């Protein structure tokens, strides 16, 4: 939003400098981006009157003039502008004047004729106006007046970067209100008296979309002189706000837009067939806009139409067929309130961005239309003449916005600002902002004014009080905080510890969606009905996940399609199990899952890049379980899972309870997911592994340990873990460890059998073991595994 400081001060004139004013505005939350002078630096330029104007005797394109600048003698000035003529009021740079660029005016002769000054154009005075020739001033411009004073050029343009919630400040009226509140200064608005109708001509108006257009005003003005010249004061105000002058009718609607904040539009009455209809467009309906472009409209776009065609995209852009031209005699002024929700996004969809759409999208004061119509009518009659008809208004009271009523608690205000502001100051600030305030036991209830769409919740009122009171006036205070030692159970295993462990082993953490494709999930977890979302993001994300494996497998596929030969991922997250007895009919259980695929290690010239297998992942899972410091509590038991290979899957058991699964993905599932090669996964209940046994210090034995190796032959179906556990069961007090170190199948071992080599470590804390002690323990172990598993010692 650009505005002229001098125009603002016509409304409110606080006793502050320009710098102080812009600082106030910025600190109030309306950030000032730039402050620029409205004209170049010059002096010695006066308002003059061309008394005589004749052709130069020796140059076809030059004219010899005599100009009155209020001095005793007329000035002889040679001018080359085509529009120079007798009777014109002009800007005259007298001898001694200094123009922008340090250009000094001196006495001179042009083709033999004396020239004691220069008739100036806008450009020569550093004024950004596109025009041909010299400036043409109003006929009543006072001769001899300093030109800077005449046009109030000791002024600046202030460019404010407004946030989307402050649509009320997209006008001089809005900025003046804000400055008045900040300085406790009265705002003087221009008097807008109703223009009495002089004719009875009206246009029928029908609003077919009242929710999108709750209020529509139309007024006919006949016999308008569109050839009239826009007054220089209006041109200047428009220019300083970044809008160029076009013609008096358009200039007036733009002026009201900038002054009042109300977008308006003018139609050529002769081009309207039947009457005005405000409706939604038909899908594919076309309209040629004022800039010559053609728009194909969507069915959700509001248009202003007559009985045969669309005349304008409502609140966004006018149509070429109904636009005002130099031939226009009669106009229809439009002034409406279009609901923001029905304008927002429409301009962008057609590649448009206008001053009108910018305001309507954010919200225009819905009580402004009547006064804006009267203001525009008065200016139109003053500048262009014309005969005025009555205003025709169509209004849907039920669809107009209702003022927001918001409660503000004293405690909330103090808590958020960290400072106590007196009750009287709070009430004064809110009332100066245009709110109606009622005091309650807990604080206040404020009714937002019609121009403040952004006042909706308690925090909005806190912000308003804080910024008007002044954040600089709130003293700095050190935060008051107490350091508290939080309880932490030593037995808990932090999730970060597990994350660090897996990252150290080459994994990357993944976060997958909790919403999954239901049919695909049935392949991974058949027989369990997932919770289906009533309003899913998409059909592919319509079920709550029953586990983490599905998301990880899809992530593996995603990476493999991007030429990643080695994938190692893990995820911590919730699974959602339907349960009638649980809160909201669903149990939310934290799970830890992982997946590996591709090569065992990164490609290296000195390392074989073998493909991963079941035991690679099993080792990583064992590392997680070993964090519990109780390696005797867990085991892997062969088990079937519908998503896993029947011969390469196991249940993870801790203290006799199944807490998870591990295995190679079933070949059929690999095919349906699109996996490339062998993929191994695991999934564990986090609550079953997040506690550890607190280790106890024990004395180390000072006596030597003894190792005995045995090789037992058992059926291939017997798990090696069961053999190891059987050894520990009967090994007695001297057996400290039993570990599998070799598995052999082949020559010398009967088909269907396998040889398991187990290292037995025996030691006493009290004495050196004798051969009889060791032999007794070994014999007991061999006898036990022989009886339990039919094992025999290998020769």
From Swiss-Prot:
InterPro entries: aa-tRNA-synth_II/BPL/LPL (IPR045864), B3/B4_tRNA-bd (IPR005146), DNA-bd_dom_put_sf (IPR009061), Fdx_antiC-bd (IPR005121), Fdx_antiC-bd_sf (IPR036690), NA-bd_OB-fold (IPR012340), Phe-tRNA-ligase_IIc_bsu (IPR045060), Phe-tRNA-ligase_IIc_bsu_bact (IPR004532). Gene3D superfamilies: 3.30.56.10, Bira Bifunctional Protein, Domain 2 (3.30.930.10), Ferrodoxin-fold anticodon-binding domain (3.30.70.380), Nucleic acid-binding proteins (2.40.50.140), Phenylalanyl-trna Synthetase, Chain B, domain 3 (3.50.40.10). Residues 401-476 form the B5 domain. Mg(2+) binds at residues 454, 460, 463-464. GO terms for molecular function: ATP binding; magnesium ion binding; phenylalanine-tRNA ligase activity; tRNA binding. SUPFAM superfamilies: Anticodon-binding domain of PheRS, Class II aaRS and biotin synthetases, Nucleic acid-binding proteins, PheT/TilS domain, Putative DNA-binding domain. It catalyses: tRNA(Phe) + L-phenylalanine + ATP = L-phenylalanyl-tRNA(Phe) + AMP + diphosphate + H(+). Keywords: Aminoacyl-tRNA synthetase, ATP-binding, Cytoplasm, Ligase, Magnesium, Metal-binding, Nucleotide-binding, Protein biosynthesis, RNA-binding, tRNA-binding. CDD domains: PheRS_beta_core (cd00769), tRNA_bind_bactPheRS (cd02796). Its cofactor is Mg(2+). It is found in: Cytoplasm. One of its GO terms (cellular component) is phenylalanine-tRNA ligase complex. It holds the Pfam family tRNA_bind. It is an enzyme of class 6 (ligase). Belongs to the phenylalanyl-tRNA synthetase beta subunit family. Type 1 subfamily. This is Phenylalanine--tRNA ligase beta subunit. It comes from Vibrio vulnificus (strain CMCP6). The gene is pheT.
């Amino acid at each position: 939003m650009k505005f002229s400081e001098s125009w603002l001060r016509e409304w409110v004139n606080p006793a502050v400098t320009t710098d102080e004013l812009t600082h106030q505005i910025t600190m109030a939350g309306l950030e000032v981006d730039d402050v620029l002078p409205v004209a170049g630096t010059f002096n010695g330029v006066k308002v003059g009157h061309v008394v005589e104007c004749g052709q130069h005797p020796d140059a076809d394109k030059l004219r010899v003039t005599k100009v009155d600048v209020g001095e005793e003698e007329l000035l002889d000035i040679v001018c080359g502008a085509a529009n120079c003529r007798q009777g014109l009021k002009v800007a005259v740079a007298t001898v001694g004047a200094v123009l922008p660029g340090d250009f000094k005016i001196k006495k001179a002769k042009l083709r033999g004729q004396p020239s004691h000054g220069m008739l100036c154009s806008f450009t020569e005075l550093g004024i950004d106006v596109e025009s041909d020739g010299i400036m043409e001033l109003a006929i009543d411009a006072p001769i001899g007046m300093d030109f800077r004073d005449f046009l109030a050029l000791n002024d600046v343009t202030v460019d404010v970067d407004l946030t989307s919630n402050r649509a009320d400040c997209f006008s001089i009226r809005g900025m003046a209100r804000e400055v008045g509140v900040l300085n406790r200064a009265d705002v003087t608005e221009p008097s807008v008296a109703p223009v009495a109708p002089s004719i009875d001509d009206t246009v029928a108006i029908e609003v077919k979309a009242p929710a999108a257009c709750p209020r529509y005003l139309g007024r006919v003005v006949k016999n308008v002189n569109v050839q009239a010249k826009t007054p220089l004061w209006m041109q200047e105000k428009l220019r300083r706000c970044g809008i160029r002058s076009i013609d008096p009718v358009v200039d007036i609607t733009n002026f009201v837009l900038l002054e009042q904040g109300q977008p308006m539009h003018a139609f050529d009455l002769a081009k309207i067939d039947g009457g005005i209809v405000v409706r939604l467009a038909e899908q594919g309906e076309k309209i040629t806009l004022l800039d010559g472009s053609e728009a194909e409209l969507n069915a959700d776009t509001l248009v202003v139409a007559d009985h045969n065609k669309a005349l304008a995209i409502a609140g966004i852009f006018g149509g070429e067929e109904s636009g005002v031209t130099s031939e226009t005699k009669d106009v229809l002024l439009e002034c409406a309130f279009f609901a923001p929700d029905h304008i927002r996004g429409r301009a962008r969809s057609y590649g448009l961005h206008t001053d009108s759409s910018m305001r309507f999208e954010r919200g225009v004061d819905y009580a402004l239309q009547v006064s804006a119509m009267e203001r525009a009518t008065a200016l139109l009659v003053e500048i262009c003449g014309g005969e005025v008809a009555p205003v025709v208004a169509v209004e849907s009271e039920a669809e107009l916005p209702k003022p927001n009523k918001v409660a503000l608690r004293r405690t909330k205000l103090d808590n958020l600002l960290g400072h106590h502001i007196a009750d009287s100051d709070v009430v004064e600030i809110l009332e100066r902002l245009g709110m109606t305030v009622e005091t309650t036991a807990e604080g206040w209830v404020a009714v937002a004014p019609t121009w403040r769409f952004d006042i909706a919740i308690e925090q909005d009122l806190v912000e308003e009080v804080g910024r008007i009171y002044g954040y600089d006036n709130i003293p700095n205070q050190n935060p008051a905080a107490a350091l508290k030692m939080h309880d932490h159970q030593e037995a808990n295993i932090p999730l970060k510890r597990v994350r660090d462990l897996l990252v150290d082993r080459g994994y990357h953490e993944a976060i997958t969606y909790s919403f999954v494709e239901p049919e695909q999930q049935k392949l991974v977890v058949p027989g369990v009905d997932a919770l289906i979302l009533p309003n899913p993001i998409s059909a592919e994300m319509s079920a709550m996940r029953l586990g983490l494996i599905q998301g990880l497998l899809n992530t593996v596929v995603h990476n493999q399609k991007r030429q990643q030969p080695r994938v190692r991922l893990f995820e911590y997250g919730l699974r959602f199990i339907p349960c009638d007895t649980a809160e909201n009919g669903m149990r939310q259980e934290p799970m830890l899952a992982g997946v590996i695929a591709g090569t065992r290690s990164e490609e290296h010239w000195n390392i074989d890049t073998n493909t991963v297998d079941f035991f690679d992942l099993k080792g990583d899972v064992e590392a997680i379980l070993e964090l519990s410091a109780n390696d005797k509590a867990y085991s892997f038991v062969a088990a079937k899972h519908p998503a896993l290979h029947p011969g390469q899957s196991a249940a993870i058991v801790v203290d006799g309870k199944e807490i998870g699964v591990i295995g190679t993905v079933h070949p059929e599932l690999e095919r349906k997911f699109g996996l490339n090669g062998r993929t191994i996964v695991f999934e564990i209940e986090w609550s079953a592994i997040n506690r550890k046994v607190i280790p106890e210090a024990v004395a180390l034995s000072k006596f030597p340990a003894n190792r005995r190796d045995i090789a037992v032959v058992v059926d291939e179906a017997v798990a090696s873990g069961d053999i190891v556990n059987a050894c520990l069961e009967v090994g007695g007090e001297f057996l400290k460890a039993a570990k599998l170190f070799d598995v052999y199948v082949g020559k010398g071992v009967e088909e269907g059998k396998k040889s398991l080599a187990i290292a037995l470590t025996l030691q006493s804390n009290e004495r050196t073991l004798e051969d009889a002690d060791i032999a007794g323990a070994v014999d007991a172990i061999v006898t036990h595994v022989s009886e339990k598993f039919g094992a025999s010692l290998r020769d």
